[in-house]
Amino acid sequence: MVTFLMASPFTHFILRNRCTSRMKKRALVHGRSNIPAQASSPIGKDFDPRGYRRGLGATNKYTRKFLNDPDAKRRMEDEGIGYSTTGLVAQIKEKNFAHTKEGVTIKLADSYGFCWGVERAVQMCYEARKQYPTKEIWITNEIIHNPTVNMRLSEMGVNFIQETDGVKNFNPVKSESVVILPAFGASIDEMKLLADMGVMIVDTTCPWVSRVWNSVDRHARKQFTSIIHGKFEHEETIATASFAKTYLVVKDIKEARWVCDYILNRGATKTEFMRKFKNAHSDGFDPVKDLDAVGVANQTTMLKGETEAIGKLFERTMMEKHGVQNLGKHYFVTNTICGATQERQDAIRKLIDEKPDIMIIVGGFNSSNTSHLQEISEVASIPSYWVDTADRIDTESNRISWKTSCGEMRETENWLPQDSLTVGITSGASTPDKVVENVLEAIFKSRAKMKVRCTINNL
């Protein structure tokens, strides 16, 4: 018998310098420069991003209202885009999170898959399509990082703004169009551009992301530099940075230590500093003066433990540099860790403690939060396979195509052994239940075909 477990609670933060290669980075022009300047009036240094966004709410051309339309929710489930109430995942939940088939026992976690912010954003897209049936609808990015969901929106007639060399082409968008801002938000530059064009803006930004924006706004009002724990090329971090006056993006604790060594005059020269962070800071950034007072925020999908460690590191650095009595003048902290991200990272802890033989991570290949779930498994030295759809599992040949947390695509033959083993399975916050169900069915099908082949070979 094969036992499958779906995750429950674990704490860990990981240093990603162990990766031999990194994910291929998109050639994004960071910050505000990816907006066609001719399409919108320029943003000055005294521009108030948070105030501007709040002001949009007073117009009749902007909404972030979630209607919670039951018809939209029902359609999402029927089309395999939302939570499952009748499918395999729902059945597993009803049976005390356990299910057995083909000699395979599945144990389901209490926190995995679609988070509230993601479900809300996708449902708002369905609601917008229903509310504006005859209008052309555009979205500034993928609504979430999941191919199944984005494909379905495309089938519904939602158009995606195209991007070339980091520059988005808004030219096809007409003033009478509806434009959706995705779950991880949009830069204030894009919001202003769209408002100046006169389009109807449907803002599906997750409230947890908005909370981070409020945090960097407070940094700016105190004239502090925002240290953003994130990936500088990630859409959410680009949006967050646009709400900051001065910012620096660090991707991990290693880069944070590099910055703190510089603050304490133990590190590199200014020239070396600027070279290392050339794509990850605000225009005109000067590490000599701009690292005198800092606040820490994060991309909501980053590792909770690592964000906390980075915050503590900067706190200790500022105490050492300026003295404990002056800490408040040089360091500002707010809790911007996303509860859903934390729950899903915690949800893998118990599973790792139970030492499963294999882990399956289900989620979009460009999903940051899913990559961290894969990373946690890899660091625990558990064979872990990250797949975005069930199509990655070849049930005929017992082969799986999967991705590492570092971005490498790999293929493994005979990945599912015939012997008894324990397999853990969880999924990222952008993954619908139906995608997980399809992966489980592919595993069951692989096991059934393995039994047939074994029987034939023994004749």
Report the location of each language-model feature.
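The feature marks the mature, well-folded catalytic cores of soluble enzymes
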Residues: A39-L459
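N-terminal chloroplast transit peptides
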Residues: M1-V29, A39
